[in-house]
Amino acid sequence: MSFFKKKLSKGKEILSKSNLKTHTSSNASLSIDDLNRFGFSLNPVLWCLDHQQGLLAIVSSTNRIYIYGKQHVQSVIVPDCSTIVHIALCAAYLIVIDSRNTVLSYPLMKHRDLSKPAATYFLKQKVTCTVTDPTIDWVFFGMSDGSVVPWDVTRHCLGKFKVPNLYVPRHEEWRMMGYSYAPVPGKLSPVVSVQIHPKDLGVILIAYPDGVVLYSIRTDEVIRFYELEYAPGSTAAVLSPHNYRRPIVKGIEWSPWGDHFVSYYTDSTFAFWDVDQEYPVQVRNFVDSNIHTYTPMQRNPPKTELEPIRSMRWCCCEDPTVSFILMLGGLPKEAPVKGISLFSYRNLPAKKDVETFAEFFANPNSQRFFPFIDIPPVRDMLVIPSSSPHYNGSHNPKNLLLLSEDNSLSLLDISTGNISNMSLSIPPSLCFLASDFRVIAFQTVTKKVWNQIEDTISVNSHYSCLFGGSPSPGYLKKLDERNLLITSTGLSLSIWDISQGFMNPSLCVNLDFSSVMRKHLTPSAFITTASFSTYNPEFSCADSFGRVIVCKRKNHKENLPAQLANGIYRLDDTLVLEGTLHAQYYIDLKRGRVTLNQMSNIGFVCIGYQDGGITIIDMRGPHILCNTSISELGLERRGKPDPDFLTSAEFVVMNPKGSPSSIYVVTGTYRGMTLLFRIDPSSSGRFSAYFESSRQLDIKNIYKICSLTQDGQIATATGSSLQSVGYPLPQEVFLVYIGDSGISVFNKINNQVGNLDWRKPVCCRAALVLSTVSKHMGSVVCVNSDLSVNWYSLPNLREERKMQLPLDIDKNRLKEGDILGNGDYIFPTLGAHELAFGCVLGSGRTLANLAPMMLITHNASHVPPRPSKSLWNWLLGEQSTSAEELDILLGGENRAESKVHTLETPKVISARPAESVKQPLTPVPSMTSQSAQSYIPPRRQQQQKGFFAQINDHLAQRGNMLGGIENTMDDLEEMSAEWANEIKDSLAGTKKDLILSGLKSYIP
């Protein structure tokens, strides 16, 4: 339902009351529309990335699960369980494990009530880790009793296969031998980590605190144990905090080629292993290498305390043989700067012996360090791959998502090592988790203005790290105006068009002022306020050091003069495109923090400072029309320790004393004083500002001033209203002052026609709303500190109606939000990093009416081919387990049928954007809303042959190939023998000729 209609008028920039009226009757009932939530509730705890579907799942401290995709794709699941400890995305399912060992399975491939899981299963043991692969329908659970059990995702049950605790017999052997590191009887080592071989699904690495085990699912036996023990007197033994020389395993990572792996330990060391050797190839830490061996000539370095290694990932480039290791932590504790270490290994050595690889891992091709300078210390990192979903999710990553200790997020560009602007790459809601993210303004502009600044989007366009999901088109709620949500991160500004109910990155203008202000850059500077002109593509923003940046569209015909006034500084940017927004100049009067930044619609800017300063700027010069202060005007109250300062301003054309109309600037202060300035043209063609009068109101903190005429039209100064300057006005202008403790309505400046005082609750935000449900001139809608919304009619200020905001809005942070004249509001919620978006001119919509978004857009059964072992290894007898073989090994010959049904003839729709696709992915069908609710993507068909029959087929195929090679070698041998015989005959003939010719030379 719309409460506004469009009215044609001669002036295209007039927003009158008739523009905002509807065809509804005056007694129509109104209620609040709760439209959407932007941001993230409280703090992130866990995360999981499904690169096959391009989805990212993050668990918040409120036990909510947010699932993100491309653009503004977002779904929220609130499971009915205890604290979530593990999540996994596999085969278009979300697997959730809580602290009570309950497994919940949520299907994501269709629209349904995601609050109810498809299956619930109760485990007997605690899950310590999970791992999966995009080509299988299984999730491996590492258990607290040391076992590994597979979870059948599509059958919602555990598999028949189980890996027992592989260290139980080994512990018994240690106790029999009397080793000091043997655990006490009855103590079971839990599983620390499980990793699937990057080229063989039938081989897994299982990490226990005591060591690492290479296990074959195909043969159901242990291949090898890997246990690190330092040599006596070695560097690692000297630095080790343990009495015995065996560190505790903390994690493992496969190499991309699968012949090596790395394990890292609680004493900040990490070891490289060859899968064919029981002894480490190389053991090192951040400082030194070969720290596990001892030689009589070596000198132990001074003891350096290292911080623990928090995480380690072994990634590869487009070519899997070119790899690098990312290590979070492991630095010396006395290091002044923390960061992430990168060890690059570009080319594998041709010689495969242990000594060569020991030297290879000891001396990386390059070693880089990414310091945490502008962000807090990091406690976890997430690799976002850009190519295939294989190689344990670390194939050619471009970005790294960092979770800091203060629960903020940052995005690191791996190629440059710099912190990237998150609004350009990740979902908008996650931008709220940036450490320096701020919501600084919420206001309305005309559609014409938005169309003019929309060209700036292409300058810093959004490129999403995620590609999953199908975004909802939203709803067209506004016709001739746009709601702008303005946010900042440091000196970067983001302008979001949220008129359709979403923060869509494709409708976001990103401006970065750090580059143009590099000569004037102050460390830790950030933008605090911003003000847009409603009818012109220009705005101003202030930073934390009192500088005001003025931005306009680039126009080669409008150039700044060669010499500017004192306090105004030029910002030159030669790379600005014609017709795009850019920072033209900034104002720095050295007066402290900016308390008011008000951009007019007629080319003026009013600035208020913390010291009581008042500055009016004419953008046509630019010129400083007025630079004074409240104390210089003699209006400062005696006995007050802190100076009064401006908090609001309004530009209006009026004739307060019956004289010809002029341009006036009406300002309000924190202590309830109003100041009136008149702007007149001078003989030189410029404008001049003069102080006229002041008045003390019984209102504290006047944060909003509205002007309107007697017939209910907005009287804010616009380009068309300047035509009436110098002439009598046809209607009287009313001024409405709104503060924390009351409202006052004046006409003729000093004639008070309405007054309303309140103490509790406090009016935190208010707006002038013109609608058919309001009588006379309109209504003032006040949002109070108890979340109530009161409507007061103008000019008599009688209460019309009362509403209640959603209860999850934070009543203590209402001043951080705002409400607009069209009834839309933005207020922070109790979620700390979340905003509630709604409208007081609504019909009672709730979040349950929000259109759902499709998360699964790629067929889960069509995955890019998984890397496999080389042909030479295959000829030598090594077998790779396929996904179908793994289904039989884990689920048995009589595995139950999948509970996922298929459609017979799907219709193909567009897949992932071409610029972000490295390998083709098959999309799912295009569906209507009705068929989408029953659609589930097809899964792999059940393998018909038995396991032993498949082995026989593989052996026969290998025998045929080996037989062909044998025949080829026989042919080569025969050809070589014939060629040797020919050479032998030729040499014999040549020798005979030489002998005969020599004999002839002696015969006379």
From Swiss-Prot:
Pfam families: Lgl_C (PF08596)
Chief location of this protein within or outside the cell: membrane
Keywords recorded for this protein, A-Z: Glycoprotein, Membrane, Transmembrane, Transmembrane helix
Transmembrane segments: 38-58, 77-97, 188-208, 324-344, 422-442, 599-619, 726-746, 823-843
SUPFAM superfamilies registered for this protein in UniProt: Tricorn protease domain 2, WD40 repeat-like
Molecular function as annotated in GO: GTPase activator activity; myosin II binding; small GTPase binding; SNARE binding; syntaxin binding
Name this protein carries in UniProt: Uncharacterized protein C1F3.03
Organism: Schizosaccharomyces pombe (strain 972 / ATCC 24843)
Membrane topology of this protein: Multi-pass membrane protein
One GO biological process term: establishment of cell polarity
Family, similarity comment: To yeast YPR031w.
Glycosylation sites: 27, 392, 418, 421, 627, 859
Cellular location(s): Membrane
GO CC terms, sorted: cell division site; cell tip; cytoplasm; plasma membrane
